[in-house]
A protein has these predicted regions:
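Extended beta-strand-rich architecture
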Residues: 1-208
């Protein structure tokens, strides 16, 4: 025999921010990207590879872990992009084509010793290798470039239905001058993308 529960079920409260993040993941996977989840732990030296050596480095202090397993896991990351580049570097040893993304937090310490740290969620995408994988049909062997990434981002922004989206020339120390663009929606910058700076590319052991 079955007996119905007499009490009403509790009201289920939604999480709009989590719903948006899941929607973002679905759209990115639908464009053919693979999601990764990397460690939040790193070192300042490893993270700084995403910037040219002669450019200004992070001006905010890294958050140091009190009792890390090892020095390599002794700090909380400043950049999701640095984590995805590290993962791509390892995977490039066994795969010719990479199309990766990660959505996750990056952490910044406060200059005030009594201040609370800051946690920001960011999206990073890395493309490398041929546009298509070899198969029984002829494939496009040309390398993915700036415009492949722009196409993915255009599809993403269309799916999110953001208003007044624009792509304009931009600048970022990680990216090649003249091959970098910023994205704005409603006059507010929402992202930046481009081809990796040659000086950054030289610090990674893979054909970025």
């Amino acid at each position: 025999p079955e007996t119905r529960i007499s009490d009403k079920l509790p009201l289920q409260l939604g999480n709009p921010e989590l719903d948006k993040e899941e929607r973002l993941r679905d759209l990115l996977v639908n464009t053919g990207l693979t999601e990764i989840v990397s460690y939040r732990w790193t070192t300042p030296e490893r993270e700084n590879r995403r910037l040219p050596k002669d450019s200004p480095q992070d001006d905010k202090p890294h958050l140091r872990i009190a009792n890390p397993l090892a020095y390599e896991k002794g700090f909380l990351r400043h950049s999701v992009l640095a984590s995805v580049l590290d993962t791509a570097e390892r995977n490039a040893r066994v795969r010719d084509r990479l199309a990766l993304f990660e959505i996750g937090p990056q952490f910044f310490g406060s200059e005030n010793p009594d201040g609370l740290p800051e946690e920001l969620h960011r999206l990073a995408i890395v493309l490398s290798g041929p546009r298509s994988l070899p198969g029984w049909q002829p494939a496009d062997a040309a390398a993915m470039d700036f415009f492949d990434l722009k196409g993915i981002l255009t599809t993403l922004l269309d799916g999110l239905r953001l208003p007044e989206v624009r792509f304009d020339p931009g600048e970022h120390p990680s990216f090649h001058p003249g091959k970098c663009a910023k994205m704005t929606s409603g006059g507010k910058q929402i992202g930046v993308f481009g081809e990796l700076h040659p000086l950054v590319r030289g610090q990674y052991d893979w054909p970025v």
